[in-house]
Amino acid sequence: MQTSHYAAEKDMQDAAPRLTFTLRDEERLMMKIGVFVPIGNNGWLISTHAPQYMPTFELNKAIVQKAEHYHFDFALSMIKLRGFGGKTEFWDHNLESFTLMAGLAAVTSRIQIYATAATLTLPPAIVARMAATIDSISGGRFGVNLVTGWQKPEYEQMGIWPGDDYFSRRYDYLTEYVQVLRDLWGSGKSDFKGDFFTMDDCRVSPQPSVPMKVICAGQSDAGMAFSARYADFNFCFGKGVNTPTAFAPTAARMKQAAEQTGRDVGSYVLFMVIADETDDAARAKWEHYKAGADEEALSWLTEQSQKDTRSGTDTNVRQMADPTSAVNINMGTLVGSYASVARMLDEVASVPGAEGVLLTFDDFLSGIENFGERIQPLMQCRAHLPALTQEVA
């Protein structure tokens, strides 16, 4: 199993073109960097060989403050209501996104903060008010990531799963949801009437101090169409191991969808960074993590990915369950020396429509420090950053 995975990765690397390019000055400003904070236990490695830890406010505070020190542009937390089980109890232990990010907003000063709303669990008027509150805490640095919900057991356990027809109507639901949000954030009042929501002189005040950013992570046609109409930017998965531009067709689809609406909606790409002094040392880490893959948890993920038969084949959850690199849910993975990772991230920045990356790390605290000290200074697309001047714990 391990050998075949390695062979598949080598094939992908050999097939991927190596790009030689020079970034224009204006392009350098495009490449935003974010951290996908570990709100669930063990981060994004489903392996008995990976660091094992519980999510805590103190851990995430240290991560986001360190990210802010190194000029990361934003921090995002997901929402997960039920995990995958297995030996590692993967994602069986999770904090809640809005309350975590409210706390992090209070202990940071510059970095943009995003929480995720599981829209089946929270009425839009409540999310509008919570977001306005965190806007006040953060001084206008807050935004909302909207998710429709794909993991049926998360909602069945609470008795709120609306039935499997929801898979084909979830973006209709989300469209009404965001229209209510926009009403309440814009004017403080909504009388919206739809199939899913009925507002009757609904009020929210105070309103946010700045326009509230809304983000989404749609890769299906319906998801991209939603993002093209309503999102400020759209997350997508990177693909493969050391194939930094393999996501380019997805970014092109998003760009085309946005052109149909006359809006500018860029792609922010999810990657895991596994870096070390040399390529071989980083590769050894990656192989070690794969050798400890929690097969029981991975089997549960595969089973769940097959439940949605109505959204098409190009969805986030289908990619997550692909066996090629399931140990880190098949997000794009950059494995190499600090210089190699910097070069690959510059290649990401060269893809039309790619405006930023959302990073995870095998070890978040040391990973962010190594990124800030050893990787970012080598990146052309981050050359505009000021020099570091303050100490970080």
UniProtKB/Swiss-Prot annotation:
Record GO biological process: alkanesulfonate catabolic process; nitrogen utilization; uracil catabolic process
Induction line: Up-regulated by the nitrogen regulatory protein C (NtrC also called GlnG) and repressed by RutR.
Family matches, as Pfam families: Bac_luciferase (PF00296)
Catalysed reactions, as listed in the record: uracil + FMNH2 + NADH + O2 = (Z)-3-ureidoacrylate + FMN + NAD(+) + H2O + H(+); thymine + FMNH2 + NADH + O2 = (Z)-2-methylureidoacrylate + FMN + NAD(+) + H2O + H(+)
The entry's keywords: Flavoprotein, FMN, Monooxygenase, NADP, Oxidoreductase
Protein origin, superkingdom: Bacteria
InterPro entries found in the cross-reference section: Luciferase-like_dom, Luciferase-like_sf, Pyrimidine_monooxygenase_RutA, SsuD_RutA_monooxygenase
UniProt-annotated binding residues for FMN: I79, K80, N145, E154, R170, Y171, S220
CDD domains, per database record: Alkanesulfonate_monoxygenase (cd01094)
Entry's EC annotation: 1.14.99.46
MF term (GO), any: uracil oxygenase activity
Summary of the function given for this chain in its UniProt record: The FMN-N(5)-oxide reacts spontaneously with NADH to produce FMN. Requires the flavin reductase RutF to regenerate FMN in vivo.
Sequence similarity: Belongs to the NtaA/SnaA/DszA monooxygenase family. RutA subfamily.
Name of the protein in question: Pyrimidine monooxygenase RutA
Organism: Escherichia coli O18:K1:H7 (strain IHE3034 / ExPEC)
Gene: rutA
